[in-house]
Swiss-Prot record:
Gene Ontology CC terms, in alphabetical order: cytoplasm
Protein name: NF-kappa-B inhibitor-interacting Ras-like protein 2
Major site of localization recorded for this protein: cytoplasm
Cell compartments where the protein resides: Cytoplasm
Family to which the UniProt record says this protein belongs: Belongs to the small GTPase superfamily. Ras family. KappaB-Ras subfamily.
Residue segments, region Disordered: 169-191
Gene Ontology molecular functions: GTP binding; GTPase activating protein binding; GTPase activity
Biological role: Atypical Ras-like protein that acts as a potent regulator of NF-kappa-B activity by preventing the degradation of NF-kappa-B inhibitor beta (NFKBIB) by most signals, explaining why NFKBIB is more resistant to degradation. May act by blocking phosphorylation of NFKBIB and nuclear localization of p65/RELA NF-kappa-B subunit. It is unclear whether it acts as a GTPase. Both GTP- and GDP-bound forms block phosphorylation of NFKBIB.
Small GTPase-like: region residues: 1-191
Keyword Nucleotide-binding attached: yes
GO biological process annotation, one example: regulation of tumor necrosis factor-mediated signaling pathway
Pfam family, one: Ras
Assembly behavior: Interacts with both NF-kappa-B inhibitor alpha (NFKBIA) and beta (NFKBIB) in vitro. However, it probably only interacts with NFKBIB in vivo. Interacts with GFOD1.
Amino acid sequence: MGKSCKVVVCGQASVGKTSILEQLLYGNHVVGSEMIETQEDIYVGSIETDRGVREQVRFYDTRGLRDGAELPKHCFSCTDGYVLVYSTDSRESFQRVELLKKEIDKSKDKKEVTIVVLGNKCDLQEQRRVDPDVAQHWAKSEKVKLWEVSVADRRSLLEPFIYLASKMTQPQSKSAFPLSRKNKGSGSLDG
C-alpha cells in the first residue's frame, strides 16, 4: 500500500453523497431510509486499483451545498481527487457540479488532481431531469470521467472508484530530463 490519498466528495444537498460512500464502503445503505444532513465526515477505505494494489483512500464527505454556497477553502488543500455528485432527477444539482468543477480548476494551482463525476439515482428514470448525453458531452469537454450510478446497485459504484484510486496512484513516469552521471554535480545539462 502506498500513500493515503485525500478525496473530497461534494455536490448539492440531498444528491446522495453520504449514501454512495456508505454503500460503497460498508454495503449498508437502505434505499428510502431517512436522510440525515451531513456536516462533514471522513471515511477511510481500501480500494484495489486496476494494477491489483490496494490503496488507502480518505474520503472527505462534505456538507451539501445550498444557495450559492462555495466549497470550504480547506477542501482544496492537499487534495488528490474529487468526486462531484449530482442527482439525475435534478437539473440544478448538475449545474452545481459544473460550477464546482470551475471552482476546483481555479483553486488547484498547477497540481494534478483526478476528478470523477457521478450522476446518482439513475434508476429513477421517470423522474430524470438531466439528459445523459448532455452530461457526457460536458464531461468530455471538461476532460473528466462521468458515470451514472445508483445507490440501490452497489456494483454500479465500483468502476468509478477503482478508476479514481488507480488514476491517483499511478506510478510517476520517469523524468523528461534524465541526468547522466557525468553531469550530476555540474549543473549543466549539455554533454
